[in-house]
């Protein structure tokens, strides 16, 4: 009955959204109608919904330009990388969930929680402050942020909702961007994620506030990003017995999701962090004429029309303000019969000589020909602009990061942790605090490609200094205090790349650490792309390769807490990773093939071990004697990955597939599912030629494997190490059905997730003992506002 009542509520919400959209479209068509002014002239009501005769809105009855460009920047050099705006209609619902657009992430159940990619080659390297890495859905790195240049002020509002006040999830995202002129732009973004949780002690909230600015002048370019984040996650340690989900009939009572017992209560992970990113450069070069884009031409015409209308209104106002019966004074030229006073100067004999530098117009035909040539030149000038071509750039990039983490617990089950190293709050309470401060400066000099026909590639050289500071608990006898560690690193490197042209692109970057904690580290990265025509279509061949020799990050080497402790700075070796990857895509058949081979030496990871007691009752104690440590595998690990992206289309029917095969040489150290499948079947059509509709369903499926467990005290995923308590996950189809629509730029959807929660083996876990949400209806909308 409860589920039926919620379904009725959701249906009412859907009807309300559709009615609102219909009403807004209907009223928009009624925005203007006739009115008669004091002079008897018939006009239309102003677009701002009033009859004010002094309204000076210069955008009335003219199309507001909606051109928008978005890009990301290279984190080291600040290079502009054009990208698509985040306004895509396709897979819009899936983009709002932290299990990924293609369902490729393992999570700890609720939306916005910690996650880890099942596709190993798509995982990112660990950051200096590892505790925020699992929140990659929420955290936006500087090289992932979308900078914006818009022809008119732009506001985007996105809202997603499911559930009710006890268990629901809400996401609200607002982004504003405006350009002062074609060079200077700024904006801000606010994001609030809140999931109350369908299971006990599972609420999570994130808040982000970001301010960004760009200046893209001829000689000076700058990108600035300031962001602050607050994250608070309630940790429940998973449910005490998986049978509550997989075999609920084995219990005498029926348990709602929020009644299933969990391991932990009153345990929290709190993170606060602040980030500043500034990349700027000074360019030395020259000017040349280039054609304008259609959007730039429209913007110029819009500005010209606005200026003319403003001048016309000013002239009309000038005439209306004159006294009645008295015409306004206007110059009418020289009066008839007027003579010039004084004597006419004598003519110089040299005036009779012909000026050979001037064009002689001696006939009407020649005058018409010159006028036509001038008209053609004026037409060309109207669509041309002057572009600055940089030759050399002086580059500086600054990154500043400030982190604080607090793991707080008021209750811990007896025997849950194996070890205890100190006590701060007394009893079983925990208050472990960690801080990290980082400043990185990169100075570079670049010789840019394309400033002449012989410069086919760009060259860059750079030097980087990085300062890192860490604070965490330490002990001296029985005294607990905050100890501080500092690190300084200096590295140098270079880059050669080719990004212009349509056929061949490549990029080779190398960096070597000269001094500091990370001395002797090495990073070599190479990628290339080749395009060529085949059967009247385009084949794209891309390849990537890298060799990284890096130290494990600070908290792998050293970590102190009340129940977990290690100092391995003298024991861990540098981790070496080598990967070669190829991509082949052919747009005619909608096919893309990705193949990667990777070898890892000294693979460093977290291992987690505990005893799992299960007596089959509601009072089952769950995990006990938990311990987590850092492990390093001495032998080489090899990983093979093959991905097939294949799309089919037959009329309105579309079928998209991503099939991933992975093979690890050591599943005990690096477990991955052998197969991971995402499939999306939907109908794509229009209603009344204005409403775009995608109606269908998608499924995510992966084969059984020993997925990484999750440790709340560390906020990290860790490999299962106790043979007696290991569990396998997988072989459950996660099916979602949806109606995804777009109307005049407004995107909205209705989705029912995990449709098969009561079918099959009911093994809807992606992390051991953390079930995913059951069947839930989601609704969301994204609305753009221009001007």
Tell where the protein language model's regions lie, with residue ranges.
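A generic structural signal for short coil/turn motifs at secondary-structure boundaries
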Residues: 7, 164, 196-200, 515-517, ...
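Membrane-proximal, glycine/serine-rich, low-complexity loop/turn segments characteristic
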Residues: 30-277, 281-352, 356, 533-538, ...
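Exposed, low-structure sequence patches enriched in small/polar residues
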Residues: 16, 150-152, 226, 260-334, ...
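Intrinsically disordered, low-complexity segments
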Residues: 22, 27-30, 354, 361, ...
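Bacterial Sec-dependent N-terminal signal peptides
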Residues: 1-38, 739, 751, 774-787
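Generic low-polarity alpha-helical segments
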Residues: 1-4, 11-15, 24, 28-30, ...
């Amino acid at each position: 009955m409860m589920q039926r009542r919620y379904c009725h509520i959701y249906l009412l919400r859907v009807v309300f959204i559709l009615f609102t959209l219909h009403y807004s479209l209907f009223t928009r068509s009624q925005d203007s109608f006739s009115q008669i002014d004091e002079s008897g002239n018939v006009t239309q009501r102003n677009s701002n919904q009033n009859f004010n005769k002094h309204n000076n809105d210069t955008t009335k009855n003219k199309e507001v330009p909606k051109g928008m460009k978005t890009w990301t920047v290279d984190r080291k050099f600040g290079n502009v990388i054009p990208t698509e705006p985040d306004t895509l209609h396709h897979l819009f619902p899936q983009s709002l969930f932290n299990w990924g657009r293609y369902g490729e992430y393992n999570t700890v159940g609720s939306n916005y929680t910690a996650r880890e990619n099942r596709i190993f080659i798509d995982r990112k390297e660990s950051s200096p402050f590892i505790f925020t890495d699992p929140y990659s859905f929420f955290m936006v790195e500087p090289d992932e942020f979308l900078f914006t240049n818009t022809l008119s002020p732009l506001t985007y509002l996105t809202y997603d909702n499911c559930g009710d006040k006890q268990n629901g999830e809400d996401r609200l995202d607002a982004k504003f961007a405006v350009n002062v002129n074609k060079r200077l732009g700024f904006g801000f973004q606010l994001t609030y994620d809140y999931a109350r949780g369908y299971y006990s002690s599972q609420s999570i909230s994130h808040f982000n506030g970001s301010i960004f600015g760009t200046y893209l002048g001829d000689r000076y370019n700058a990108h600035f990003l300031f962001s602050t984040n607050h994250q608070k996650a309630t940790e429940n340690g998973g449910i005490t017995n998986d049978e509550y989900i997989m075999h609920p009939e084995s219990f005498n009572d029926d348990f709602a999701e929020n009644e299933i017992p969990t391991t932990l209560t009153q345990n929290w992970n709190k993170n606060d962090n602040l980030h500043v990113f500034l990349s700027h450069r000074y360019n030395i070069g020259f000017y040349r004429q280039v054609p304008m884009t259609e959007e730039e031409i429209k913007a110029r015409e819009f500005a010209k029309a606005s200026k003319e209308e403003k001048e016309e209104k000013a002239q009309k106002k000038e005439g209306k303000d004159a006294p009645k019966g008295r015409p306004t004074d206007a110059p009418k030229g020289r009066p008839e019969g007027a003579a010039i006073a004084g004597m006419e100067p004598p003519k110089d004999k040299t005036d009779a000589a012909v000026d050979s530098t001037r064009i002689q117009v001696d006939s009407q035909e020649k005058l018409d020909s010159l006028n036509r040539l001038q008209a053609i030149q004026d037409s060309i000038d109207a669509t041309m602009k002057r572009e600055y071509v940089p030759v050399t750039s002086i580059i500086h990039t600054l990154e500043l990061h400030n982190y604080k983490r607090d793991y707080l617990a008021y209750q811990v089950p007896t025997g849950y942790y194996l070890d205890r190293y100190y006590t701060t709050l007394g009893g079983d309470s925990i208050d472990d605090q960690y801080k990290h401060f980082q400043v990185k400066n990169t100075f570079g000099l670049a010789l840019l490609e394309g400033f002449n026909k012989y410069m086919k590639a760009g060259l860059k050289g750079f030097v980087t200094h990085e300062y890192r500071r860490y604070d965490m608990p330490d002990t001296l006898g029985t005294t607990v205090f905050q100890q501080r560690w500092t690190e300084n690193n200096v590295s140098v490197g270079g880059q050669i790349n080719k990004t212009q042209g349509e056929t061949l692109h490549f990029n080779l970057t190398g960096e070597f650490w000269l001094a500091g904690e990370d001395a002797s580290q090495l990073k070599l990265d190479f990628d290339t792309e080749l395009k060529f025509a085949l059967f009247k279509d385009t084949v794209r061949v891309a390849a990537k390769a890298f060799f990284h020799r890096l130290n494990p990050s600070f908290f792998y080497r050293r970590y102190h807490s009340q129940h977990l402790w290690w100092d391995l700075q003298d024991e861990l070796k540098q981790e070496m990773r080598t990967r070669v990857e190829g991509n082949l895509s052919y747009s005619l058949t909608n096919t893309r093939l990705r193949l990667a081979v990777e070898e890892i030496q000294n693979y460093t990871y977290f291992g987690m071990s505990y005893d799992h007691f299960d007596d089959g009752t509601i009072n089952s104690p769950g995990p006990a004697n938990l311990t987590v440590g850092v492990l390093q595998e001495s032998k080489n690990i090899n990983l093979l990955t093959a991905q097939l992206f294949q799309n089919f289309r037959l009329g309105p029917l579309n079928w998209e597939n991503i099939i991933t095969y992975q093979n690890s040489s050591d599943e005990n150290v690096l477990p991955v599912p052998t197969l991971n499948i995402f499939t999306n079947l939907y109908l794509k059509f229009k209603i009344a030629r204005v409403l775009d509709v995608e109606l269908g369903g998608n499924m995510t499926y992966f084969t059984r494997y020993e997925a990484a467990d999750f440790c709340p005290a560390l906020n990290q995923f860790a490999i299962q190490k106790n043979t007696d308590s290991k569990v396998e996950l997988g072989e459950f189809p996660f099916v979602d059905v949806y109606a995804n629509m777009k109307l005049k730029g407004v995107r909205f959807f209705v989705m029912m997730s995990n449709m098969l929660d009561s079918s099959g083996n009911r093994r809807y876990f992606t992390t051991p003992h953390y079930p995913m949400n059951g069947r839930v209806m989601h609704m969301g909308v994204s609305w753009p506002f221009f001007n």
